[in-house]
């Protein structure tokens, strides 16, 4: 029994001490390549969207999305056109007067092999964001938000967003 515990402890220690090198640069995609990157044009695009959202810069935010981009938030069962979502954001921000701070988001872009033609060339962007909002009355709220983006040819095709709506 002691030997089994010692072997398990040794194996755990060995695996805990070895960490794979983080891949930080890959912008090419083919049917057999996979990558996860923390920098590059797709990450810059996500940063641009989050910065524009936080600043209420709706025109800049709109330029990041394709003309046919769709948006789902939380348990939406039907996608909303991104242009309609941005208009909704604009109206909500105008009425609430919120000042939004995105903090320091964590971004990644994942590329995976596919044989499905509808996903060819798409990269999957992910962002974890701790939003802090302050209303014009001074009330503050925080929301941990996860966003998944489908990105192709320098534009976002869709966003799926998960956050606590309370």
Residue positions per predicted region:
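C-terminal motif of bacterial Sec signal peptides marking the signal peptidase cleavage site
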Residues: 13-16
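Hydrophobic pocket/interface hotspot
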Residues: 49, 60-61, 69, 85, ...
């Amino acid at each position: 029994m002691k030997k089994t515990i010692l072997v398990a402890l040794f194996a755990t220690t060995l695996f805990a001490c070895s960490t794979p090198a983080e891949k930080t640069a890959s912008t090419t995609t083919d049917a057999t390549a996979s990558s996860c990157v923390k920098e590059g044009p797709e990450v810059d695009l996500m940063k641009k969207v989050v910065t524009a959202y936080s600043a209420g810069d709706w025109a800049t935010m709109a330029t990041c999305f394709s003309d046919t981009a769709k948006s789902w938030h939380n348990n939406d069962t039907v996608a909303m056109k991104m242009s309609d979502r941005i208009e909704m954001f604009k109206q909500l921000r105008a009425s609430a007067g919120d000042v939004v701070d995105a903090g320091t988001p964590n971004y990644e872009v994942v590329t995976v092999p596919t044989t499905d033609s509808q996903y060819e060339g798409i990269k999957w962007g992910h962002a974890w964001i701790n939003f802090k909002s302050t209303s014009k009355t001074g009330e503050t709220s925080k929301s941990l938000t996860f966003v998944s983006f489908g990105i192709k040819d320098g534009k976002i095709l869709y966003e799926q967003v998960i956050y606590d709506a309370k």
